[in-house]
UniProtKB/Swiss-Prot annotation:
Ranges annotated as biased composition (Basic and acidic residues): 1-12
Annotated protein name in UniProt: Translation machinery-associated protein 16 homolog
Compositional bias annotation for Basic residues: 13-32
Similarity section: Belongs to the TMA16 family.
CC terms in the record's Gene Ontology section: nucleus
Region: Disordered, residue numbers: 1-32
Pfam families for the chain: Tma16
InterPro entries, A to Z: Tma16, Tma16_sf
Length: 180
């Protein structure tokens, strides 16, 4: 970027072809940087989400989660900000006369939770299907870095998908009981 700035300073006329080409080159580099930054932010958010789920699963557990356990874990994930929201509400109740001090943080939390709940109920949260033994093993082997998140195969885990998995597991259990 500094080389571009130096070259722009050398240009004599602001409407010359060289000046326009350098401006175009600068905009292109800026746009590339924005795209890279967007990918980095997304992988950081996904990495934090996966590390939260990994931290909630028992260390010694080798068998995959049952669909009901995964649904309970997702519901627990939705309550991860409850303590912080309680603290904000407590601070607001103490000083009624002051302006809402933590309104921005509270709004971000509520919007995030609303978006995630809506995703879970409709299309699905971008997560690893922890009901699959191979994906659970991949999550266990993950080093926790945001750079390696892109190598993990993520699924869209939705409420409807978990209901289908529950029905399949019930059918499987009943067929096994019929055989014995």
């Amino acid at each position: 970027m500094t080389n571009l700035r130096k070259e722009l300073e050398k240009c004599k006329h602001p409407n010359s072809r060289k000046t326009k080409a350098l401006g175009k080159k600068a905009r292109r580099q800026n746009n590339k940087h924005k795209v890279r930054l967007g990918h980095a932010i997304k992988s950081n958010i996904t990495g934090e989400k996966l590390s939260w789920f990994l931290g909630q699963i028992d260390e010694g557990r080798t068998e995959p989660l049952r669909p009901q356990e995964l649904e309970d874990l997702i519901e627990l994930y939705f309550t991860r900000f409850d303590e912080e929201l309680e603290q904000i509400n407590l601070k607001q109740s103490i000083g009624k006369h002051r302006a809402n001090q933590h309104a921005a943080r509270k709004d971000v939390i509520t919007m995030t939770l609303e978006k995630e709940r809506n995703e879970f109920r409709t299309g699905g949260l971008e997560l690893m299907n922890l009901c699959d033994p191979l994906k659970l093993k991949m999550l266990r082997d993950w080093d926790g870095s945001a750079l390696s998140v892109q190598h993990l195969k993520l699924d869209l885990v939705s409420y409807n998908m978990l209901q289908r998995l529950k029905e399949q597991s019930k059918k499987k259990e009943t067929s096994e009981q019929m055989e014995t």
